[in-house]
């Protein structure tokens, strides 16, 4: 019994020491667990951010892909439409009749309507010129001549109105001059005559003129020449710009990206071609204003003679065309 008591005490001391060690281990384990939880929390936040970024990137990628597919579809539709328009243009292109005595245009209803209106206009003008010639030969008074001259000028205004409407439908028909005879087309400038050249031709037809009239006609001729040069330079710039637009980009490739680029080039070129109508309108305004200024400088009788000389000049050009086309061919 005496031997067992000390062992019992020692055993009791050992038992009292273990709970303290267990508490310290529990604290260490708890701290480690908290650190692990925080690390996992940080990892989870990074993962969530990364996942959110991936989802956003995927969403943007889908949107870009959808937009690209839509762009390709639009380009395909535009290309198909353009091919159809080109096919119609080839089927309804401008041609010259086999007899060669008359220029015909099948460039659409607009061109045909203009040709018909111009023919009626020319027929009416011939009647006016016959009346004016008869009045001059009969030595009619200025009041009678003034009425006829004003009628001729109003008729010219009607021509430029007809041409303005025609330019909206088919500006190339006006520029090509297919509504004119071959000899007239040799002198064609922006769908009509050069005012400065007509004034040169009239110089010998209107004598005698006062010094003031000569100065007025010379100034008008120079002003017209300057305006014509400016319009001609504008046309040259437009042609160069069109050439640059159509020649840019990759040639010979039919990839989807190049189709979109091609359609973009065509859209730019179409926009530039739209300015052609403005050139025709400005050229016709210059022609009309030159005629009106000429009438103001000249007397009534001189104005009548000038209008008659212009008419006779173009009549001779048309007659020359007929003779040329009817010439013997070996």
Swiss-Prot record:
Q: Where is region (Disordered) located?
A: 1-48
**DOG1 domain sequence ranges:** 111-327
Region described as Basic motif: spans on this chain: 46-66
Can you say where in the cell this protein is located?
Nucleus
Q: Which UniProt keywords apply?
A: Activator, Coiled coil, DNA-binding, Hypersensitive response, Nucleus, Plant defense, Transcription, Transcription regulation
Q: What is its biological role?
A: Transcriptional activator that binds specifically to the DNA sequence 5'-TGACG-3'. Recognizes ocs elements like the as-1 motif of the cauliflower mosaic virus 35S promoter. Binding to the as-1-like cis elements mediate auxin- and salicylic acid-inducible transcription. Required to induce the systemic acquired resistance (SAR) via the regulation of pathogenesis-related genes expression. Binding to the as-1 element of PR-1 promoter is salicylic acid-inducible and mediated by NPR1. Could also bind to the C-boxes (5'-ATGACGTCAT-3') with high affinity.
Can you say what this protein is called?
A: Transcription factor TGA2
The organism is Arabidopsis thaliana (Mouse-ear cress)
Upper taxonomic classification of the species?
Eukaryota, Viridiplantae, Streptophyta, Embryophyta, Tracheophyta
């Amino acid at each position: 019994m005496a031997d067992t008591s000390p062992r019992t005490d020692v055993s009791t001391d050992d038992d009292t020491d273990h709970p303290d060690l267990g508490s310290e281990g529990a604290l260490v384990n708890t701290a480690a667990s908290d650190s692990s939880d925080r690390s996992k929390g940080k990892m989870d936040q990074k993962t969530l951010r990364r996942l959110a970024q991936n989802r956003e990137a995927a969403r943007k990628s889908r949107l870009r892909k959808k937009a690209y597919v839509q762009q390709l579809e639009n380009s395909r539709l535009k290309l198909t439409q353009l091919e159809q328009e080109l096919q119609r243009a080839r089927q309804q292109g401008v041609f010259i009749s086999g007899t060669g005595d008359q220029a015909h245009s099948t460039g659409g209803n607009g061109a045909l309507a203009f040709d018909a209106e111009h023919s009626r206009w020319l027929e009416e003008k011939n009647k006016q010129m016959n009346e004016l010639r008869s009045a001059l030969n009969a030595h009619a008074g200025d009041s009678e001549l003034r009425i006829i001259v004003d009628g001729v000028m109003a008729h010219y205004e009607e021509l430029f109105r007809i041409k303005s409407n025609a330019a909206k439908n088919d500006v190339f028909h006006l520029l090509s001059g297919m509504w004119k005879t071959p000899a007239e087309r040799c002198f064609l400038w922006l769908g009509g005559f050069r005012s400065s050249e007509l004034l040169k031709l009239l110089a010998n037809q209107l004598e005698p003129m006062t010094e003031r009239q000569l100065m007025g006609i010379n100034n008008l001729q120079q002003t017209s020449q300057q305006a014509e040069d400016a319009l001609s330079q504008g046309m040259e710039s437009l042609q160069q710009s069109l050439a640059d637009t159509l020649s840019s980009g990759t040639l010979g490739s039919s990839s989807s990206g190049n189709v979109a680029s091609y359609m973009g080039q065509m859209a730019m070129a179409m926009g530039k071609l739209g300015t052609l109508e403005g050139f025709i309108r400005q050229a016709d305004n210059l022609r009309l204003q030159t005629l009106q200024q000429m009438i103001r400088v000249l007397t009534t009788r001189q104005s009548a003679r000038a209008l008659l000389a212009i008419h006779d000049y173009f009549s001779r050009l048309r007659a020359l065309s007929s003779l040329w086309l009817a010439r013997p061919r070996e």
